[in-house]
């Protein structure tokens, strides 16, 4: 399977550059699990599309203002994108500069203080910050929000709120779990009234999510790593949902990535079952991989040739996904992080119950 198999042409004007005034006003393309016709709805219609006893699972990671600017001792300008906070005033980061900084060099930060380059960690750099407050708190004032590169404007004050889900609580992401951006408090209240339950995982979306696939042969692609936590309470929620015949719906590809990373085969469950897990994942989901943990997902429209497009193609089938994308383009849906969404049902009904 090749990267080029996942190419599609997207008119540039369909790339959303800003969010709508209301989160839940985004359009929602409903893609049924059979060749039935697509349905054009809005995200605010979800209470009508889900059933009492269903379980929506959100990613509760919180985006940090992870972009910094500074200057090397030589005078050269530097851009820093923090990929992960490591504790002890240290971080792993991407650095953009005319020449790669060497271990031991110091970057004077525009916001005050400095960062020492400790060395390399693969494609990233390890930095130690000399600043007047804990790094996590200092970034709230000093850092800039790292909007995706296809949003061709500087981040504004509104982005501090809108590029964050209303349920974000665990600090550590450098990009938003964008499917969750469509949910506001009013919609969550209506879903609760409908009898839909909520669960949460944490996956800290890393800077690797912005990196393109650089090889055409997908078996040569090295997937980036991200930290996640699937807790025992969520595992029990999923078990209860299955027992009562409810459906499990992931809000975003990061939730699917988390659940599939925590899916384990056991003697009692030869097809696998969800187990609690906290740690790193490097899982790469593409057609041929069978997603068993969820029945449906709410997800945005993804970039051509991206690993996220490959994941949703594994879930719903390549032909179905590309037909849905063609429909969305023809109907002028808005694409990517601030764009519209899909409600995507699995092509294999019942797989979440561990059926073979």
Curated annotation (Swiss-Prot):
GO terms for molecular function: S-adenosylmethionine:tRNA ribosyltransferase-isomerase activity. It is found in: Cytoplasm. Pfam families: Queuosine_synth. GO terms for cellular component: cytoplasm. Pathway: tRNA modification; tRNA-queuosine biosynthesis. Monomer. Transfers and isomerizes the ribose moiety from AdoMet to the 7-aminomethyl group of 7-deazaguanine (preQ1-tRNA) to give epoxyqueuosine (oQ-tRNA). This is S-adenosylmethionine:tRNA ribosyltransferase-isomerase. It comes from Xanthomonas campestris pv. campestris (strain ATCC 33913 / DSM 3586 / NCPPB 528 / LMG 568 / P 25). The gene is queA.
């Amino acid at each position: 399977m090749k990267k080029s198999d996942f190419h599609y042409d997207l008119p540039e004007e369909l790339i959303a550059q800003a969010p709508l005034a209301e989160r839940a006003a985004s359009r929602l393309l409903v893609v049924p699990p059979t060749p039935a016709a697509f349905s054009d709805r809005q995200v605010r219609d979800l209470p009508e599309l889900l059933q009492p006893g269903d379980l929506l699972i959100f990613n509760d990671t919180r985006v940090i203002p992870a972009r910094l600017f500074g200057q090397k001792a030589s005078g050269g300008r530097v851009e820093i994108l923090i990929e992960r906070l490591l504790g002890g005033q240290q971080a792993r980061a991407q650095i953009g500069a005319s020449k790669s900084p060497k271990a031991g060099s110091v970057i004077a930060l525009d916001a005050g203080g400095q960062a020492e380059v400790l060395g390399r960690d693969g494609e990233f750099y390890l930095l130690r910050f000399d600043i007047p407050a804990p790094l996590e708190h200092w970034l709230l004032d000093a850092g800039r929000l790292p909007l995706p590169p296809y949003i061709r404007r500087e981040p504004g004050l509104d982005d501090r709120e809108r590029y964050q889900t209303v349920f974000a609580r665990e600090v550590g992401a450098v990009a938003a779990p964008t499917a969750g951006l469509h949910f506001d408090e009013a919609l969550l209240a209506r879903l609760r009234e409908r009898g839909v339950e909520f669960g949460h995982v944490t996956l800290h979306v890393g800077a690797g999510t912005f990196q393109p696939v650089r090889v055409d042969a997908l078996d040569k692609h090295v997937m980036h790593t991200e930290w996640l936590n699937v807790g025992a309470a969520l595992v029990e929620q999923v078990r209860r949902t299955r027992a009562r015949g409810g459906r499990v719906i992931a809000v975003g590809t990061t939730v699917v990535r988390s659940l599939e990373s925590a899916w384990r085969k056991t003697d009692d469950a030869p097809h696998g079952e969800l187990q609690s897990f906290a740690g790193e994942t490097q899982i790469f989901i593409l057609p041929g991989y069978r997603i068993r943990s969820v029945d449906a997902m709410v997800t945005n429209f993804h970039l051509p040739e991206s690993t996220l497009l490959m994941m949703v193609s594994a879930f719903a089938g390549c032909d179905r996904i590309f037909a849905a994308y063609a429909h969305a383009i023809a109907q002028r849906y808005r694409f990517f992080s601030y764009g519209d969404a899909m409600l995507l049902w699995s092509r294999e009904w019942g797989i979440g119950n561990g059926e073979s």
